[in-house]
Amino acid sequence: VSARFKFFIQTLVAVLVISLSYYFNKDFGVYKIVIPFSGVMDFKLPLALSFAISYFAFTGTVNAVNLTDGLDGLAGKQVLVILSFILTLLYAASFASLSFDISDLRIIIFCFLGSILAFLFYNTNPAKIFMGDGGSMMLGSLVAFIFIMLKLELMLIFIGFIILMEA
């Protein structure tokens, strides 16, 4: 499959995910910055800029995870750490401002954590199975989807720092 076709499919999926986020999140484009000892500061970006940030976060994450998948289990381990952090964040923080049920998101994360652990068991040196483009793009799409639905696209820079640096 050519790179242009892959990017076209990524664009279609990104537009679908961002449209769903716009539909389900009542405050699409409103970002919160937590300032220690001061509280929470809200700022609203224009819709086009918020859409662009979400689009680049999605396509960037998908391609970064795809490029990271070069060695035995490298992308799987990185996504395992990111999903574990998101799960810890969901349990530790209160996301009362979200307009959808977070328990569904937790179930999805637990399912993917289990599948990544099973994959890593068979992907140790010498690897018996490989993730390939389909698996790495799916994991990148999952991470981007979760961050977009939680309105944490800007935090993706810090949490996915290793993946972004390798890309």
Where in this protein do the model-derived segments appear?
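"…together with the soluble PPM/PP2C metallo-phosphatase catalytic core" -> "…together
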Residues: V1-M165
